[in-house]
């Protein structure tokens, strides 16, 4: 049976990173977008990088970045994954071999063919809006979907059972206030997500 991939996004403190690691997350995300309450600079990301244990993958998260911002963030964080809208990724220069996590949105366009893995969320990143689970499940029949958008400890189990995603991603759903991660909510979210496992392997993406 597959193990659900869990990403906690919007890391800004070593304490939140430690909570994610100790609670069994697989990845942590760092947001590089000035309009987000979870924004970190390249310098802040470089300092936080030392707090990320080897058990966690680092994800650099962007929304319409400049090439200069992308380059600085990658240099600082050395991310395992770069997450950005698929249209942004098409116009950016990435280091050779850099793995990407294209973002698809509810009601938005879909690339053809689908990427081997993508993040699916609502129309606005980090707004706590629930994505269209029916649309997500349809996409998940053909590729590995990381489901995001409005998830928290109360609905993630239902989301996993409804969509059968490769993984889940949470940010505002584990915060006590905008941009402030709550270590207890991180634990509760991961516990609830793991409780929804296992679910059958989809034939379409079995390796």
Question: How would you label these PLM feature ranges?
Answer:
Residues 1-120, 125-207:
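Conserved N-terminal beta1-alpha1 strand-loop-helix module at the mouth
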């Amino acid at each position: 049976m597959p193990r659900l991939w869990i990403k906690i996004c919007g890391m800004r403190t070593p304490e939140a990173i430690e909570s994610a690691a100790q609670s069994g997350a697989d990845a942590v995300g760092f947001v590089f977008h000035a309009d987000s309450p979870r924004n970190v600079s390249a310098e802040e990301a470089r300092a936080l990088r030392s707090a990320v244990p080897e058990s966690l993958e680092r994800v650099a998260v962007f929304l319409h970045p400049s090439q200069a911002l992308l380059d600085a963030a990658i240099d600082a964080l050395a991310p395992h994954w770069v997450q950005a809208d698929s249209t942004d990724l098409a116009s950016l220069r990435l280091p050779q071999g850099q793995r990407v996590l294209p973002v698809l949105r509810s009601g938005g366009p879909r690339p053809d063919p689908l990427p081997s893995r993508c993040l699916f969320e609502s129309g606005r990143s980090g707004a706590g809006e629930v994505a269209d689970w029916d649309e997500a499940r349809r996409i998940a029949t053909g590729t590995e979907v990381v489901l995001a958008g409005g998830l928290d400890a109360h609905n993630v189990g239902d989301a996993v059972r409804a969509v059968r995603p490769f993984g889940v991603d949470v940010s505002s759903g584990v915060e006590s206030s905008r941009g402030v991660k709550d270590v207890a909510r991180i634990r509760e979210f991961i516990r609830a997500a793991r409780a929804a496992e296992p679910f059958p392997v989809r034939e379409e993406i079995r390796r």
